[in-house]
Structures are given as structure tokens and as C-alpha cells.
């Protein structure tokens, strides 16, 4: 499956043709499909009547999925993502990026509705930009048993950003869990996560190691 990076690529059709030529079964999924699968994967084992807002930060887009466990959620895909921000930061400051993020979030009727609700709901974060914050904060190697279910505070996220922002890429590589392909995108990704919590006036987000892949498996085989 391919997500935002391929959906938005100028050479999307050429890329798909080349992959199919190799005999690989390949599908480009919509942001809505991506969000629904991530929501199902993250909430499948949840019980009760609590609502969840599942957040999946990607390279080109971020999916927000809202609803009760084991139901079809309301989904919106916003074109804010880590790779997209790396490119934008070549021409703007983080102060300008903050304004841009909040403007993009505010344009969504669904997100504005959720923001104004008086009902209780919990944030769940999936994918490496969010779950990886745990290991950056603790300075340890990746271990899903530690990150799954971890309640990540907004203070931890802000602390991670301040630390990462003041590091060179070579210094970030010394963080035990840091992958070489993430040394540039992790900084704007952490900033985006912080701004999302600020937008919804939330103090924490629960990390989940179960997301899109688990959601697809559940819908296909269960």
C-alpha cells in the first residue's frame, strides 16, 4: 500500500507502472481509507463508550480519525506532514510554520467541531513520529513494549523539540533510537505533534504501536 507520498507525487503514474511491471500487487489508498484503517488498528482492543481521536503523522499528510472503538470513524486528511515541512522550512521560520499549522487545522470542519465539543475524548498517536518521542525522551533503543500504551505528555514533546532543534544532524544520530533517514524530519514532526496537542488543548497523547497494518489485517481477515 502507498499513502500520501505517492498520492501527491508528480510522477505517480510512472512509479505505479514500474512497480506493477515488477509483478508487485500495489494499491494507492486515499487519506480517508488510511485514517479508517489506522483508527481500527489503534482502537480494536479498546472497550467502553469513550471516544478517540487517532492521529497519524506522515510525510505528506496527517490523518485524524474520530469515533467510538469498532465503529466507522469520521476522518479528515490534512496536507501537513514531516517531509512537506522540511521543504517549507527552507523558506519560512518555525514561527511562520506554527501559524500555518493552526490555519490548516482550523480549516477542517471536523477538527473545529471536535475542538469545540464538551464531551470527553482521548488522543491516540500512531506511527514513528509520535511513538518515537518516547525513546527520544528516554534516550533508549526502540522497544514497542515500552511505547505501546505510553502516555506522552505535552511537556515531554516540547522538551524533545527544544533538544532536537538545538542539535546538529550528527548529534541527533547519537540518540539510540534515531534512524539516519529521520534526522531531518523528526524536528518538524515533533513540532507538528506539539502544535496539534496545543490546538486541541490536550496535555497528553497515548502512543499505539497498532495502526494501519493491523487495521488492514482486521478488515481483511477477521
Residue ranges and their predicted role:
Residues 4-51, 66-69, 74-222:
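Helical "lid/coupling" subdomains associated with nucleotide-phosphate turnover
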Residues 59-66:
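Acidic, divalent-metal-coordinating active-site segment for phosphoryl/phosphodiester hydrolysis
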Amino acid at each position: 500500500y502507498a499513502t500520501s507520498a505517492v498520492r501527491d507525487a508528480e510522477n505517480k503514474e510512472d512509479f505505479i507502472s514500474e512497480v506493477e511491471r515488477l509483478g508487485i500487487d500495489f494499491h494507492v489508498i486515499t487519506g480517508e481509507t488510511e485514517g479508517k484503517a489506522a483508527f481500527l488498528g489503534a482502537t480494536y482492543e479498546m472497550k467502553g463508550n469513550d471516544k478517540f481521536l487517532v492521529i497519524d503523522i506522515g510525510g505528506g499528510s496527517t490523518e485524524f480519525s474520530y469515533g467510538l472503538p469498532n465503529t466507522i470513524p469520521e476522518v479528515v486528511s490534512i496536507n501537513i506532514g514531516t517531509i512537506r515541512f522540511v521543504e517549507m522550512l527552507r523558506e519560512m521560520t518555525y514561527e511562520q510554520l506554527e501559524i500555518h499549522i493552526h490555519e490548516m487545522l482550523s480549516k477542517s470542519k471536523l477538527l473545529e467541531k471536535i475542538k469545540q465539543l464538551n464531551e470527553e475524548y482521548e488522543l491516540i498517536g500512531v506511527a514513528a513520529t509520535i511513538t518515537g518521542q518516547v525513546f527520544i525522551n528516554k534516550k533508549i533503543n526502540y522497544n514497542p513494549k515500552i511505547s505501546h500504551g505510553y502516555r506522552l505528555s505535552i511537556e515531554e514533546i516540547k522538551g524533545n523539540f527544544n533538544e532536537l532543534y538545538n542539535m546538529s544532524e550528527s548529534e541527533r544520530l547519537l540518540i539510540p533510537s534515531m534512524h539516519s533517514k529521520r534526522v531531518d524530519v523528526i524536528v518538524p514532526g515533533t513540532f507538528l505533534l506539539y502544535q496539534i496537542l496545543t490546538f486541541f488543548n490536550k496535555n497528553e497523547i497515548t502512543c499505539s504501536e497498532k495502526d494501519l497494518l493491523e487495521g488492514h489485517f482486521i478488515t481483511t481477515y477477521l
